[in-house]
Amino acid sequence: MTDSKLRSADPELEHQTRQGLPSLVLAALGVVYGDIGTSPLYAFREALHATGGSGADRANVLGILSLIVWALTIVVTLKYVTFVLKADNRGEGGTLSLMTLAREGLTGRPKWVLVLGVIGASLFLGDAIITPAISVLSAVEGIEVVAPALSNWVVPITLTIIAVLFFVQRFGTSGVASVFGPVTALWFIVLGVSGAIHIFDDPSVLAAVNPVHALQYIANNIGSAIAVLGAVFLAVTGAEALYVDLGHFGRRPIVTAWFSLVFPSLLLNYFGQGAFVLANPEMAEHPFFSMHPEWARIPMVCLATAATVIASQAVISGAYSLVRQAMHLNLLPRLRILHTSETQSGQIFMPQVNNLLFIFVAALVLFFQNSSGLSAAYGIAVTGEMFITSILLFIVMRRIWSWKLTAALAVIVPITLIDAGFLAANIAKFAEGGWVPVAVASTMALIMQTWTAGRRLLAARTKADEIPLSAIIDNLARKKPPTVPGTAMFLTSDIEGAPTALLHSLKHYKVLHEQNVILSVVTSTTPFVPDDEKIFLESFNRHFSRLVITFGYMETPNIPRALVLARKLGLKFDIMSTSFFLSRRTILPSKKGGLPFWQDRLFISLAENASNATDYFGLPSGRVVELGLQTTI
């Protein structure tokens, strides 16, 4: 059985057959749980600060702890672990995977679901610029506890770490990825042990498992409850990573890691911080680092920094993966992709994405200067993405899983209300910094909308000028031009129309190759396409045939590799005597076009900066012929 068949038939089995469960659990710790695992650095502290100066009060501490406990229980354990992880698209997760799955279940594949997916993906990218900044900054701020005199060095050290992190992306992370899991496992063990020790400072904090404390706190503190909820949400940021990385590890390792180590360690640490603050109210400024003995603080700063770098790496890799999915789904222009591993196709480096992320992350550190300031910016993008996930999950429950309406509503309504509550709490922080991820997400959504609308308009313009392929073939059969040896493959996005490159080739060269293949590349709504479903080959006559290659949106569209499959189906050609003909369009704006003039200019700029088709499809550059033409939109 081929790898692609196995992936389609049973994605969970595929993961289990390649690696044992323990090794997958360890690997998942380093990738999936880095973000949520570093939340104890700042979540409880920011919730205390949000109370307005009375944070160390027992009722406040118990209320905040109860809110954190039940946020982790409902948002992560109930929503993501229990339901969302089951909504895989042939083994893959993430907003775009869920969007394509939901669209499959609806008649006519409505555009509003696509819009939700675009917004969700844009919000993820808005969050991706904040996670590295707040995570690394909060870890380095431990220096303020260890050596207050070095406080002025927090920002320079943070910027140095971030610069190194983004610089080494070009070399790949496969060499050090093997230590991510063990380091993160050590981090969670230390979280759990240090928290368990300090619970004995005031064991009464365990009463916070009773949700009554959370409800009482909200009822008794209407004025500050919104701000506190916004800070409490920081404890669950990173929950979306469970679903984003589903395709890398499978559901079982992610669930096992959550229940066996991550969830217990987080609870113990938050309870420990709460007990420590009740016993030492003066330490509420930096409870995480302060609750460790002096001899352990420097090692904890180092371990926390390592954990936040790993968490940042996971977010960066997630951004690469999301952008690649968006490219293959034609939501973004083609960008340059470099593979940094010979054995793992998921190990990629995208220079343009990397540079933009670095600029934004560094700018955030310089602008906000501390993690408390950044916490105001953190959350609004994640809550928005989680809210969209709930809507898409409801569609999947009804249309894909065939749940009854009452059952689906019984699950989704409470979850969505909680999502809405957290979203409202984070929207309240818009002026303090929440505008940052919203601005980034809005920009990304505008780019995606412009690209899809521009491509649609360009396709319509092109189709209006095209001649049906059947008409060209019939005409050439009657008036056969001179033929030359070899094979010509003409790439086109329109399966029925005659490729513009073919028409221009006939016009300028006035010859025809012995064999002409009309080649189209199609992206499926599934993440992976089995080899036996990848190729559609149709012969018109001895000179012309049509070849359609279908790739999944998680696959790298490598045409030469796919041609090996086509050869097995009877396509005869010699790669060394095959020429690939492409059309390179120069797009001109028009004030009478279908888009506003400024959006025309944006689309043209995106098209001009897109990676060329030769590199994108892995074509041998020495065998490619590009024919230029102008199109007005």
UniProtKB/Swiss-Prot annotation:
Keywords: Cell inner membrane, Cell membrane, Ion transport, Membrane, Plasmid, Potassium, Potassium transport, Symport, Transmembrane, Transmembrane helix, Transport. InterPro entries: K+_transporter, K_trans_C, K_trans_N, Kup. Transport of potassium into the cell. Likely operates as a K(+):H(+) symporter. It comes from Rhizobium johnstonii (strain DSM 114642 / LMG 32736 / 3841). GO terms for cellular component: plasma membrane. Belongs to the HAK/KUP transporter (TC 2.A.72) family. The chain crosses the membrane at residues 24-44, 61-81, 114-134, 148-168, 180-200, 222-242, 258-278, 298-318, 348-368, 377-397, 405-425, 427-447. It catalyses: K(+)(in) + H(+)(in) = K(+)(out) + H(+)(out). It is a multi-pass membrane protein. Its main location: membrane. Pfam families: K_trans, K_trans_C. It is found in: Cell inner membrane. This is Probable potassium transport system protein Kup 3. The gene is kup3. One of its GO terms (molecular function) is symporter activity.
